[in-house]
């Protein structure tokens, strides 16, 4: 799926170097196709890096995807140039009257922060409430999963004593579910979080269907039966080096972090890690776009009536 982005977005050249099909707005305007409109609420500090990661996964199908980047934190960023934010991001007020086929809410490094202490917690709640009537399907990632479970289902914040960091094995629970179609019975995916997602807790509080779990019984992938919301508690979008960058950052900060599990060859941080989750990440996002967005979204977005057959 060629992603449609502004011509000047840094991700264009970055992804083209990887032979990822990126269609600029100027080229896409010549095609008589109604693109899928996907809004990305990017909560990560290094926004350009996160853009590259998600756009890579959204690019692998024959339809156009029109990407809109959203920010809700008005504070000055220490990790992303203000010019980039001003040029490529919109504020909620700019899009609140629009409808979208899909919404992705990224993770954020807020695992040890109480919800009410998050600077933009009211804005998160506002976006989630708005999405019920303006978005066909929403995908929450990592910390955003914890936030959404609290806002939508009242699940209290669950925090691990130690950070979960590494590449973990998971197994699917429903092999014929659309979101896991084509998955191997067992697959690897990276995690980097303090948030805890016991599968039993999610079953107790919600009617969400858990589609994949970790070997330890944590929920990894789950969704509503109507396909309107989906949750992934790990980071299938991560680059091969992302966990390493986080590890060495914490080492330099004197935090004495654990070496990420099952990540560095021979468990030696001096060895170059390899991504063992790329096929899983690509398939997950392709399935979400196809079965949870494209198959049920209305052709005319002015009328939000997803087909939930």
Swiss-Prot record:
The record marks 192 as: Important for substrate specificity. Signal peptide: none annotated. It is an enzyme of class 2 (transferase). The active site is at residues 142, 235, 237. Its main location: cytoplasm. GO terms for biological process: L-methionine biosynthetic process from homoserine via O-succinyl-L-homoserine and cystathionine. The keyword Glycoprotein does not apply. Pfam families: HTS. It catalyses: L-homoserine + succinyl-CoA = O-succinyl-L-homoserine + CoA. InterPro entries: Class_I_gatase-like (IPR029062), HST_MetA (IPR005697), MetA_family (IPR033752). Pathway: Amino-acid biosynthesis; L-methionine biosynthesis via de novo pathway; O-succinyl-L-homoserine from L-homoserine: step 1/1. Transfers a succinyl group from succinyl-CoA to L-homoserine, forming succinyl-L-homoserine. Homodimer. Belongs to the MetA family. This is Homoserine O-succinyltransferase. It comes from Escherichia coli O157:H7.
């Amino acid at each position: 799926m060629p992603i449609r982005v502004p011509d000047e977005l840094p991700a264009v050249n970055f992804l083209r170097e990887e032979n990822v099909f990126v269609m600029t707005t100027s080229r896409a305007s010549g095609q008589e196709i109604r693109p899928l409109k996907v809004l990305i609420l990017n909560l990560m500090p290094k926004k350009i890096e996160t853009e590259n990661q998600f756009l890579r996964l959204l690019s692998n199908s024959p339809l156009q995807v029109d990407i809109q980047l959203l920010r809700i934190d008005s504070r000055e960023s220490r990790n992303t140039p203000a010019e980039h934010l001003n040029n490529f991001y919109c504020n909620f007020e700019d899009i609140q009257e629009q409808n979208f086929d899909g919404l992705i809410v990224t993770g954020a490094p807020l695992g040890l922060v109480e919800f009410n202490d998050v600077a933009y917690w009211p804005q998160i709640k506002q976006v989630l409430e708005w999405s019920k009537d303006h978005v066909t399907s929403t995908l929450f990632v990592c910390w955003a999963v914890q936030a959404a479970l609290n806002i939508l289902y009242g699940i209290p914040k669950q925090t691990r004593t130690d950070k979960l960091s590494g590449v973990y094995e998971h197994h699917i629970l429903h092999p014929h579910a659309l979101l896991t179609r084509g998955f191997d019975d067992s697959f690897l995916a990276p995690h980097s979080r303090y948030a805890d997602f016991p599968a039993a807790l999610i079953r107790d509080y919600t009617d969400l269907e858990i589609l994949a779990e970790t070997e330890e019984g944590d929920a990894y992938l789950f969704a509503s039966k109507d396909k309107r919301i989906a949750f992934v508690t790990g980071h299938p979008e991560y680059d091969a080096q992302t966990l390493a960058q986080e590890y060495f950052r914490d080492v330099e900060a004197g935090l004495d972090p654990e070496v990420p599990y099952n990540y560095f060859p021979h468990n030696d941080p001096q060895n170059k890690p390899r991504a063992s989750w790329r096929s899983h990440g690509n398939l997950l996002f392709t399935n979400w776009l196809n079965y949870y967005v494209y198959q049920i979204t209305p052709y005319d977005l002015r009328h939000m009536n997803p087909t939930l057959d």
